[in-house]
Amino acid sequence: MMETPAESVRARVSSVTFYNVTQTAGRWWAIWVVGIVPIKREDVETLIVVQACQPPLGGSLEPPVVNAPSTTELNFLRWERELRRSGGLIAMLADAAEKDLFDLSFRTRDRRLLSAARVEDEQGLIFQPLFPAQVVCQSCSGDDGRDQQPPPVDGFGSEMEGEQTCPHAQRHSESPGQLDVYIRTPRGDVFTYSTETPDDPSPVPFRDILRPVTYEVDLVSSDGATGRGGDARRHRVSLKILEPAGGFESWLVNSWSMAGGGLYAFLRSIYASCYANHRGTKPIFYLLDPELCPGGSDFQPYVPGFPFLPIHYVGRARPAFWHRAPHSEGLLLLDLNLGVSGTPLADALLGLDARSGQRRGSLLLQQIWPPTRKEINPRHVCTREGGEGGGEDETTVVGRAEATAILEADATWWLYELARCHLSARGAPVGTPDGGGQARDAQTWLRALHRYGTSDTRRALGGLYTAVTRVLLHAAADLGLTWAYADEFILGFVAPTSAHPSEEPLAQAFLQGVKDSEDASRLDRDVMGGEATVARRHIRVKARRGPGCLLMAIFQGDLYVGGCREHSGPFLVWHEAFSWTLDQLAARPEADKAPPSHDHLLTLVRDLTRRLAPGRRRNRFWALPRAWLQRLRRAGLRLSGSHVCLLDKDGARPAPCQTATEHGLSPTAYFREIMAFLLDVISALHPGYTIPMEITRETDLLMTVLSLF
C-alpha cells in the first residue's frame, strides 16, 4: 500500500455546489464541488467532497432540455440540501459564514477533501471578498426580451413525460432568437459572445472565463492510500468541473438575462461544449429563476450545480444576508412550494444553526404582538373606510391624536441582536451599524424568520418582539407619553397637549429610561449573556415638535404618518405622497374643525404634481411598496427581485429595474390611488365629505399633463 501525497491550505469557503450522485462498489455517493479562496490569494480554487448516501429518488439527474424542472427534480434538489445538513465534512463547509476560515487537507492527485478544521484565532487577518464578474445578456427577438408578456396566473404547467413541472415552467421552453453576452472580470478581462442561434452546436469559447479541469476521484478510499492490483481504479469516477478564471467568485448579471432566458441559453451552450465528449459522470444543471415560483420571489436565483459558482442579479434590493455564502445559496427553495418553509432546512437557509438545540431565554414572554404588526392605537382611530366586502388590506384605517411632541423609537437593531443570539445564528446575517450595516437589511432578515422559520423560531421571535415592545412602552409611560402607532419594529408615541417637552431632552430621557430598565437588563442577560446593553445603544429615537395634530392611516396594508413635516422637497419614491398628504392636512389650523377648503385642496393637488414630476422617468420611483406586492402576489402576480411592479391602465404588472420608465406606465393610476387615499382620510375625519367637482377636473388635467412626459 502506497501513500498518496496530500496538501494543506488555509482558506475561506466561497461556494458549495452539488455535482451529482453516482453508484459504485454497491453504494451511492454524493459529490460536491467546494469553491475556496486561500488567504493572500485572489483566485478561486476547487476541492471535491464525497459522502456515502442512501439511494436518492430517481438516481442521478441528467441536465434538462429546458429550464423547467419537474416536481421530482425539485424534490431531488431539496433532498440534496437536507443531505448537506446530515453531518460530515460537507455540513461544516455548507454552514460556513462568509468570513469563516478553515484549515483544509486534501489529496493532491484528485483534490478530494480529507479533513477540515475551523480556525478559531484568525490572527488579525482581514477578510476581503473577491469582486463579482459583471455579466450582461441581451436576448430574445425584439428588444432584449421586452416583448415578453407577463406570465399568466394559473396552476402547474403542462405535463412533461408524465410529471408536473413547476409553475411558469414553459417560460424558457423556447430559446431566444438572438444572444449577445458581455462579461467583464474584476481584472479588466473582457469576454464577448454573439450568435443568432443560441442552440448552435458549435463550441463556445468560454475558457477565458471558466477553466475546465478533470479529476479522477477515488470515491471509496479517503485515507490517502491506493489499493492493490488497480482495484482503486474501478472505484474512481471522472469529474469535469469549471474553475473561475479572472479573480472573481460569482457572477452579477443584469435582470434581462433572467427574464429573457438568455443566461440559461448561454450556460446551456457552455454545458454542451464542455461535456460533449466527457465520458464520466455529468453534473446537474439548473438555473432556478425566481419567476419559477408561483408568486415570484425576492430571493436570488439558485444554481445548485453547474457552472459551480453563485449567480446574483441586479435587483431592486439585495439585503446582505441573501449573499452570505455558502449557506444562503438556495433561499429560493423557500418560495418553490416544496414544503421547505417552516422546516429546520428553512432555518438553516436563513442562517440559523438548526442543529445546535441550545437557545437561551427559557423565560421569554409569550407572543402578544407579531413582529409584522401595523396598528394604530384604537383610542385614536376615527373610523374605517373602504370598499364593500373588501378584505383587511382594502380597508383604510385613519387615526388622529393630539400631540405637542412626537417620539419615534426604532428597535430594529436591538431585536436583531436578541434574535441573532437567541436563535443561534451562524455569524452575523447582516453587518452591524458600526460596520456600515443597514437597518432595512436587518428588518428583511427578521421578516423572513417570521414568514419562513419553524414554529419554534416564529414563537421565539414573537416573544422577543413582545418583550422589547413592553420595555419601550414602559419607558414612554414613565415620561407621560402614550403610544400612537406601531409599524413593525418602530413604535410612535405622542405627548399630550398639556405637556411642552423639548425634542432633544425628551429623546435623551427616553433612551435613559430604556437603559435603566430592569426588564431590559434581564432580557439582555437572559438572551445574550455577557453582551448585555451592547445592542440597546443602537435604538434609534427621533423626537420632534408636533403641529398639535398627528394623523395616521393604514392604506393598502402600509402605515403612513403625517404631522412630522419631513417631506419638504421632491419625493424619492411616489408613495411618499401619502405621508406628505397627511402632513398637509395636519398642518391646517382648522384640521380638527372643518374639512379643507377648495383653495387648500387645489394647492395640495398642484404641489403634489410638482413633487411627483422629477421622478417620472424612473421605474424605481414608481415601484409599488412591499405591502402592496404581498397582496398582489396572493392574487396571483409573479414578481422576482430583479423587477419592480408598476401600474398601467390595465392594472399592476412587472417591469425591470432599469433607468427609463416604461412607456405603458400610467400616472393616472397613481393619482387615482392618492386621491382615493385623500378622500378616505378626509371622510374619516369629516364624515359625509365629498371632493368638489372642480378639484376632480383639475386633477384630471394635471394627470394628463404629467402623462405627456
From Swiss-Prot:
One of its GO terms (biological process) is viral genome replication. It is found in: Host nucleus. InterPro entries: HSV_HEPA. GO terms for cellular component: host cell nucleus. Keywords: Early protein, Host nucleus. Signal peptide: none annotated. Pfam families: Herpes_HEPA. Its main location: host cell. It comes from the Viruses. Residues 141-176 are annotated as: Disordered. The keyword Ribonucleoprotein does not apply. Associates with the primase and the helicase to form the helicase-primase complex. Interacts with the origin-binding protein. Interacts with the polymerase catalytic subunit. Belongs to the herpesviridae HEPA family. Component of the helicase/primase complex. Unwinds the DNA at the replication forks and generates single-stranded DNA for both leading and lagging strand synthesis. The primase synthesizes short RNA primers on the lagging strand that the polymerase presumably elongates using dNTPs. The primase-associated factor has no known catalytic activity in the complex and may serve to facilitate the formation of the replisome by directly interacting with the origin-binding protein and the polymerase. This is DNA helicase/primase complex-associated protein. It comes from Epstein-Barr virus (strain B95-8) (HHV-4).
